[in-house]
Amino acid sequence: MTSQKIVKRLGKTSIVPPHGSDELKPLLLEGEALSQALHNAKNLPKITLSSRERGDLIMLGIGGFTPLDGFMNQADWQGVVDEMTLKTGANKGLFWPIPITLSTSKEQADSLAPGDEVALVAEDGEIMGVITVEETYTIDKAHECQQVFTTTEEEHPGVKQVMEQGEVNVAGAVKVFSQGEFPTLYPEIYKTPAETRKLFEEKNWQTIAAFQTRNPMHRSHEYLAKIAIEICDGVMIHSLLGALKPGDIPAEVRQEAIKTLIDNYFKKDTVIQAGYPLDMRYAGPREALLHALFRQNYGCSHLIVGRDHAGVGDYYGPFDAQAIFDEIDKDAMLTQPLKIDWTFWCNACQAMASTKTCPHDAEHHVKVSGTKLRKALSEDQEVPENFSRPEVLQILRNYYESIAKEDRAEVKLVGASAQ
């Protein structure tokens, strides 16, 4: 669906509505309601959240997972895992690509009954919210992993998370107390869906492309974003601020590098930088669908989907995350993919290009990837000038110079990143 068709479908001055709802459904308490709920929660039984569950809870709180009202029950878990469809309640039949679940030990689950309230506590002890128990249930973890990640190998970081989670899932509606450290650690870029929607309205943007990133932006990323600017009113560079895998570059370094790129190489008022609180799942195609779905809640009409979106290692083909959008119902969600082919620097063209636009043989191409860039920098290798802008490279070099060589995580080139 083109940006023009989306505008026509939504109305002349509309931003894309939230997924499955006419309005955002944030679950974050404020004011007196928050004070009272926090006071009551101190005397409740507690479930300690994993990092992934904490990020999911915050997304529920800020409306990023609209229209969900909490962690999924067994029927919804099964429907999402097998059919990418919710099966119960007001959201029955709604598209959802990845299960959003809470787990605990069998011992604790045995002590819970429907209707019980349980405090949800971060690993540092902060009470993040409460859940009203609907049910507890066990799952086939290997089945979830095979369906969502297409593998059960525990070398896959997303599979490892699922296999290590608690034995029993706890379903129920939640009330959220906190957005964690994100608003204070990243005050310039951390934004809720309500805040990005307001920003888009102020800029009079109707069609917005989200660019998902967990890396500093190199020349291929810059090229993808500029293609999107030609098609849409604006681009939101949306950085993941939650947990990553070893060897990935911290969010504060990425924030500085991306700001420098925007300030020096993008036209004013065509792009904004924002951040969101999730951890990476590395679910490849399924995660690309989730990325598009919650970007709809943030107000984005499009998601840029390039090579190996949300991938890790060699678990997915370079364009599997594009192909999966053709496998779902066309009305599954409103946010549409901007599918862009393999991009690279061409020495013959003396410019960035793609396999669709460049007539020259592969010997002229310099294929750029975030993994290649991280590997070169972590090993103090020379980085070709066509990999990244010099101002960005300097920020990244400064970061790696601050880490002793023996403390740097090994970066391996496998799968699409090695090509």
UniProtKB/Swiss-Prot annotation:
The keyword Mitochondrion does not apply. One of its GO terms (molecular function) is ATP binding. Pfam families: ATP-sulfurylase (PF01747), PUA_2 (PF14306). Its EC number is 2.7.7.4. It is an enzyme of class 2 (transferase). The gene is sat. Keywords: ATP-binding, Nucleotide-binding, Nucleotidyltransferase, Transferase. Gene3D superfamilies: HUPs, Sulfate adenylyltransferase. Belongs to the sulfate adenylyltransferase family. This is Sulfate adenylyltransferase. It comes from Psychrobacter sp. (strain PRwf-1). It catalyses: sulfate + ATP + H(+) = adenosine 5'-phosphosulfate + diphosphate. The keyword Ligase does not apply. GO terms for biological process: hydrogen sulfide biosynthetic process; sulfate assimilation. Pathway: Sulfur metabolism; hydrogen sulfide biosynthesis; sulfite from sulfate: step 1/3.
